Regions:
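Long, charge-dense
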Residues: 91-93, 97-121
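Flexible, glycine-/basic-rich loop-and-beta segments that form/coincide
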Residues: 120-141
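Short, glycine-rich nucleotide/cofactor-binding loops
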Residues: 47-57
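Beta-hairpin (beta-strand-turn-beta-strand) motif
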Residues: 52, 79-81, 107, 119
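N-terminal, charge-rich interaction modules
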Residues: 1-27, 31
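Mid-chain, well-packed structural core segment of small domains
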Residues: 58-94
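Short acidic low-complexity segments
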Residues: 34-44
């Protein structure tokens, strides 16, 4: 398996949701035999979003939070430069949802991925998902 996909915990045999992905990354995932959905059709144990700017990030993050299973894996990807998104603005946006980044993986020369978990500082202990229950993330490293 591709080492980047391994770091992202993308494994074959599961349906995953990847929103707004660049074509080259999407093809890389599909070449590994992973069942990729590009539109929200169900609930998923793995959701990854690619946002080029804050406005797009807010929309995609809302979509992701409505599609993620309670103990799902959630990744937020943004460009390394040339946009209004950077590490500080991404972490500020995540904090609005009581989410936090727990790991960072460079995908290539353009994109950075942040593994998201529910913030331990949150009063209610998790983000209410559309499926019911609280998203906490599964980070265990």
């Amino acid at each position: 398996m591709n080492p980047i996909l391994k770091k992202l915990r993308l494994v074959s045999g599961k349906s995953v949701l990847i929103l707004n992905s660049p074509d080259d990354f999407l093809q890389l995932v599909k070449n590994e035999g992973i069942d990729v959905h590009e539109e929200v059709e169900d609930y998923y144990s793995y959701v990854q979003i690619f946002a080029e700017n804050r406005e797009e990030a807010e929309e995609l993050l809302n979509d992701a939070m409505n599609a993620i299973e309670t103990d799902g894996v959630l990744w937020f990807c943004y460009p390394k430069s040339g946009t209004d998104l950077n590490e500080k603005t991404v972490f500020n946006l995540l904090s609005e949802y009581d989410l936090s980044g727990v790991a960072k993986v460079p995908l290539n020369d353009k994109w950075i991925a942040i593994h998201i978990s529910y913030s331990d500082d949150a009063e209610d202990g998790g983000f209410e998902t559309e499926k019911g229950g609280k998203f906490r993330g599964d980070y265990d490293e």
